[in-house]
Amino acid sequence: MKLVSFSAALLSVVSISGYANETLQLDPSLSTVGWKGTKKMGSAHNGEVKVKSGSVSFDKSGQLTGGSFVIDMKSITNEDLKGSPDYQKKLVGHLSSADFFDVEKHPTASFKITQVKPNKKSKNEMTIAGDFTMIGKTQQVSFPAKVTYSKGKANGEAVVKIDRTKFGLKYGSGNFFKELTADKIISDEFELTLKLAAKK
């Protein structure tokens, strides 16, 4: 899936004193996960999936201590083919099928933070690591994120690169199907652009 505020946005190590331990809930109405997938020849598709739920925790110094979120895989949409509704519907149907995300069997994907590494040069920037679960398989991913936290609210942004083949999603992969011509090869990696918002 071309993979997501998807959750990195909730992890911030901000050296602010005066906060009590606090857990904030993701606001699905203010959070988005965008996806982008590409082919070897350069073409690309993009769209969104909805955030279903999630939370993030900060300690009394304002430092992120944990977080997680759930994505509704049945909500996948496409944006770049709006001018071709028949093709758009076909693409979304294919992405939802067993060739890709098999959303009937696996209606959600999720991420759980396992580590936050602060950026010493910027209090709002960090590297987040955690367990990403998709299609019934879990792999660790890490990515840079920018997060702000103040007065019971948090916002975060990140771009996460996912190697779909590590989750068993091998359709169209040139690394697994050597007979594919270049115009049929789909990149193993896709991107999720996360823009997440949380509040009490």
Predicted regions and their residues:
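Bacterial N-terminal signal peptides that target proteins for export
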Residues: 1-7
